[in-house]
From Swiss-Prot:
Family under the similarity heading: Belongs to the complex I LYR family.
Claim: Nucleotide-binding is one of the keywords in the record: no
GO CC list: L-cysteine desulfurase complex; mitochondrion; nucleus
Keyword Mitochondrion tagged: yes
This protein's encoding gene: lyrm4
Pathway recorded for this protein: Cofactor biosynthesis; iron-sulfur cluster biosynthesis
Alphabetical GO biological process terms: iron-sulfur cluster assembly
Keywords: Mitochondrion, Nucleus
Task of the protein: Required for nuclear and mitochondrial iron-sulfur protein biosynthesis.
Natural source organism: Xenopus laevis
Stated name of the protein: LYR motif-containing protein 4
Length: 89
């Protein structure tokens, strides 16, 4: 993987994790973070440039989905779960 591809992938990974932290729902937040980490780990050894480009494109689409869902979740917020209240102590 070239240096520019590597920096693009790492940047996108960090942005996706940061955006996932914005989910108001504990379950959505933990699921999204776990899926992002697992997906990036699974594909970390890909060397084919075209496949990397395809994966980057798919990840950018998923980032858009995450951002949209975070916005929708904030519009229709629900009560916090008991486990979320304990996290802030």
């Amino acid at each position: 993987m070239s240096a520019s591809s590597r920096s693009q992938v790492l940047s996108l990974y960090k942005i996706m994790l940061r955006e996932s932290q914005r989910f108001s729902s504990y379950n959505y937040r933990t699921y999204a973070i776990r899926r992002i980490r697992d997906a990036f780990r699974e594909k970390k050894n890909v060397d084919d440039f075209l496949e990397i480009e395809t994966l980057l494109h798919r990840a950018k689409e998923n980032l858009n989905v995450i951002q949209r869902q975070v916005t929708i979740g904030q519009m229709y917020a629900t009560h916090k779960l008991v486990i979320e209240s304990a996290e802030h102590r």
